[in-house]
Swiss-Prot record:
Biological process annotations from GO: proton motive force-driven plasma membrane ATP synthesis
Organism: Cenarchaeum symbiosum (strain A)
Gene that encodes the chain: atpA
Swiss-Prot/TrEMBL catalytic activity: ATP + H2O + 4 H(+)(in) = ADP + phosphate + 5 H(+)(out)
Protein name in the entry: A-type ATP synthase subunit A
Family membership noted in the UniProt record: Belongs to the ATPase alpha/beta chains family.
Amino acid sequence: MTARGKIVWVSGPAVKADGMSEAKMYETVTVGEARLIGEVIRLTGDVAFIQVYESTSGLKPGEPVEGTGNPLSVLLGPGIIGQIYDGIQRPLKELSKKSGSFIGRGITTSPVDMTKKYHFVPSVSVGDDVIPGTVIGTVKETDLIDHSIMVPPDHAGGKIKSIVSEGEYDLETEMAGIEKDGKTIPLKMYHRWPVRQPRSYHTKYDPTVPLITGQRVIDTFFPIAKGGTGSIPGGFGTGKTVTLHQIAKWADSQVVVYIGCGERGNEMTEVLVEFPHLKDPRTDKPLMDRTVLVANTSNMPVAAREASIYTGVTIAEYYRDMGKDVVLVADSTSRWAEALREMSGRLEEMPAEEGYPSYLASRLAEFYERAGRVRALGSPERNGSVTLVGAVSPSGGDFTEPVTTHTMRFIKTFWALDAKLAYSRHYPSINWMNSYSGYLADIAKWWGENVSKDWLDTRSEAYGILQREDTLKEIVRLLGPEALPDEEKLILEVARMMKIGLLQQNSFDDVDTYCSPEKQYKLLKMQVDFYKRGQQALKEGAELADIRAMPVISGLLKAKMDIKDDEMPKLDELAGAMDEQYKGITGVKVAS
């Protein structure tokens, strides 16, 4: 029996209704004559507190509230890829057809096109035993995505009694019948799943495979693993959104879920305009063919921001269960936390630090704990991952505020954006002294097996140079660079070269926007070798001025833009030229 009550109190997106004794926590309800979508977030006796996902303008006490009997759920099936949804999985294209440029209230529409036909290829036969997660067949969703039709995780399983033959079917067709205890349960191409409930998996693995983003400062110095968690905190204008766009564009994942949570609408427009024209570097297909957008911009209802995060991560888990690597980018979790703060204030809860609710930390933990690299349920055996990257927008760039400090407890990769670097035109403005990665030891084996055995040692040497330069900066500030010996002046010179030739990256340059792991390693190795050979040359009597005047320095700084990923021999030639020029300075062969 569904709950039926009446509105007694309205305060912004929060509504109180009585006569709701039949309602359940987190049940979806329709509110008012306009049938606005809402969710029960607190029950006191027969009074329900409801957060409404649409504008409550014009609602008045006495209007009806009706329960649906179901929690807030998303529809999972073919047709999700390439869509742009609002926070509760309503496709914005369909909403614009119904209500024009401004979204009307109380509009409901199907998240995917139920009449579109897909070519289904069955992978089980009549009489086969199936369990939750078993793949019964596949359809081609886009040129990049083979979509597995799976037995839902909450299904009882059983024996296949009937299955359709290969052919074209729409989403409402019964694809299979599964018999269990004398009952036949029909299975369609889609099913629904509650957004607040994590999807089940068989086994969770340690994150040992790096997520290659093509951004040198991330992949080389502060890597993130597939199935890992990362955060990009930064104040206004530090380049959070462009950095997240770069990760969404170039990360080596099969699916990208991009959640615009409370940010400017123009940023989502940028993604919509750019992605269809950009090609996936591995498949040469449009990036929109692997992307799902959840747009909940700053002028949309506040309550739907919270839902948008859960909607996005549930879609990500669904594709993970197919055995795909998924990257979920949330921009920004601070706006989500602000939505929690606003709802908490409306409900008159006791505020904690800076007005945020006391359960902020547990909500952040719930979100980040849904990341991971797993073996999916059922057969065939397949591994997938969900990597979560959240932007944090601390007001005034203050990293001690609650959202940043709580986020740091639950993530292992922290990319701290620095306003000073951004204002000096150093992008991505990731501060190499404040950032860290907890995945370095886990993924070093992959780099050793796939790129170079000495990758970790080379990376440590390069990072050591940057750390020493940071300590020397204080002396230089007080006494000037002339107070340093030549060996330390060389450290300053090589650190400057690393910042320009390695750490800086132009996301708008066709060559430099993406850097392959092999090119990253060779650029890194050349910088470290330049330093080692410089130290050796100084010991053998060479002048620092001669080292600074070497023509190869210009080549080292420009190699990131001049040499493409498929032109690795040119980098070897550059290393050879560096060798020869050092020989010319010292007059003897320098040991490598």
